Amino acid sequence: MTAHDDPAAVLTRLLHAIDALHWPGVRDCLADRVETDYTELFGGEVHRGSGDELVAAWQALLPGFDATQHITGPVLAKPDSDDLLLSTHVRAFHRLAGAEGGELWGVHGHYQARLTRIDGDWRISELALRMFYQEGNTGLPELAGKRAASSPRAPRPEIA
């Protein structure tokens, strides 16, 4: 059984690849068109774009942190027509050593994802974060974005 056979593993694999900065692994979990909703965290609008655009957006931010770690709870799945709706708790930790205002930023909430079968494999076609709360230095994303452009951290080895 591959990660694309097990819907819950697709979401877990995505988050592991994000934390490792393994961009081919991230892209492999996504549909060609993806809707992302981080409005409860960052404001703005729901984004609809390509999987490649989403990877590029994450590449412009996440390598600026010294480390990220996304921890999820059990993943619940519910059929919705030909798709599956997944939900899980998430605690996302972000670290940037020596940052003014504190080196940790935590985002805690619930991920909701829609998985669509594409050529027999499950892919994420929608991803939304439903916020519970944040803690720590909420200015870290801005600092990490600047650092990602100038001195990004190196990827970690891919996790199976």
Residue locations for each model-derived region?
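Short, low-complexity N-terminal intrinsically disordered segments enriched in polar/charged residues
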Residues: 1-32
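Aromatic-acidic/polar surface patches that form glycan- and anion
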Residues: 3, 7, 19, 47, ...
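Generic signal for short, ordered secondary-structure residues
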Residues: 4-5, 56, 94
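Poly-acidic low-complexity segments
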Residues: 22-25, 37, 129, 137
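A solvent-exposed, acidic/Ser-Thr-rich amphipathic alpha-helical stretch
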Residues: 25-91
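A beta-strand edge to alpha-helix "cap/lid" segment located at domain peripheries
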Residues: 63-160
